Regions:
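RNA-binding accessory domains that recognize and position tRNA/RNA substrates
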Residues: 2-193, 198-218
């Protein structure tokens, strides 16, 4: 498969829930995730970010959008999210995964850089995660011999990550840190006094991080 540089680089955002959500009971977790999805949709609507689908699978959200980088940066401010990764989506076929990794490596790696590949899978596939990593590394070194690239599994300049989920695969090289905490709106409202300058604002922000919508009082 030959990939064109004119093709949009990222078409998906992998949205990871905050760790606190994962340790809740099934009923509470479902409630929190539902609220989080509502908050994500509200942010996308507020910034007029187009998207085709927002799917919850395997304890994550997968946002299909042609504005993946912009969406990830805006959503990183949503309480309840731990991190977000603009990603390329493809099928779970080994050849297509490797082709996408080589394409992304060509855009991200510079002369003399080191790199690593990591792979995580959910489901049954005719290959192992280690086989994916070895093939990705081999093909990248083969594709860009003039860059003087090297593999470094401890402190690479660029890490190419592959997540295989049943019949789909997602390739990315970045993770944008989220603010964590709980989804805004899962706790009762609180009154926040804004007369104490920066300290009052910080206290209000921390209350929001615990899921409490603020009632601002000047």
């Amino acid at each position: 498969m030959r990939l064109s540089l004119a093709e949009p680089l990222f078409d998906t955002v992998i949205v990871r829930f905050g760790g606190e959500i994962g340790i809740k009971g099934a009923w509470t977790r479902k409630l929190y995730e539902r609220r989080l999805i509502e908050n994500v949709r509200a942010v996308l609507k507020h910034y007029a970010i187009p998207y085709n689908a927002l799917v919850r699978r395997f304890g994550r959200l997968y946002l299909k959008t042609p504005s993946a980088w912009d969406a990830a940066k805006k959503l990183s401010r949503v309480f309840g999210l731990s991190s977000l990764s603009p990603a390329l989506e493809t099928t779970s076929k080994m050849g297509e995964i490797v082709d996408k990794c080589v394409y992304l490596a060509g855009l991200r790696l510079k002369k003399g850089n080191s790199f690593a590949a990591k792979c995580r899978r959910v489901g049954k596939h005719p290959y192992t995660s280690q086989e994916v990593c070895r093939e990705v590394g081999r093909r990248i070194l083969e594709a860009y011999p003039l860059l003087g690239l090297r593999v470094d599994l401890t402190r690479p300049n660029v890490t190419l990550a592959v997540e295989v989920r049943e019949d789909r695969a997602f390739i990315y090289a970045d993770a944008i840190q989220g603010v964590g905490g709980l989804p805004l709106g899962v706790q009762p409202r609180v009154v926040c006094l804004l007369k104490g300058g920066a300290r009052s604002a910080a206290a209000c922000w921390l209350a929001m991080k615990r899921g409490c919508p603020p009632i601002l009082v000047h």
